[in-house]
Amino acid sequence: MTVVLDTLVAVRRTAMDLLARREHGRVELTRKLRQRGAEPEMIETALDRLTEEGLLSEARYLESFVSYRARSGYGPARIREELSQRGLQRADIDLALRECGISWQSQLEDTWRRKFAGHLPIDARERAKQGRFLSYRGFSMDMISRLLSGRDMDD
């Protein structure tokens, strides 16, 4: 059964249903509503109203996304890139990453321990393997090299 989003009420209801499942950014919500056949003007009107009512919040979405991805073992560079691909503003992303309260050093150590059981690399090949994995996860090379050299992260 196809849902027809031909009224403002239907667009709003669908948007609220999506927001009830999880936080969404405006760009993502717009895309999903367009896929369901809603007119762009109705989407904008409905989303403006939801924003005014505090039901749609980019800040809440950013906070939720950063927290979720960090708990999944991803670093700030990877999270920043994913949010950029979702159409969010770079300044908003950077602010969310700064204010999230996550210790990226601790996050790096936890991710490394889960993957490599806390074993420092014994040769260049293993060091490269661990470094590639952590870099792919979005941690800076500076943080990675400090961790893999066995130096205290707070130095």
UniProtKB/Swiss-Prot annotation:
Q: Which gene does this sequence derive from?
A: recX
Q: Which family does it belong to?
A: Belongs to the RecX family.
Q: Which HAMAP family match?
A: RecX
* A Pfam family it matches: RecX_HTH2
Name it: Regulatory protein RecX
PANTHER family linked: REGULATORY PROTEIN RECX FAMILY PROTEIN
Origin superkingdom: Bacteria
Could you list this entry's UniProt keywords, alphabetically sorted.
Cytoplasm
Q: Which organism is it from?
A: Pseudomonas fluorescens
Function recorded in the entry: Modulates RecA activity.
* Places the protein is found: Cytoplasm
One of its GO biological process terms is: regulation of DNA repair
Cellular component (GO) terms are: cytoplasm
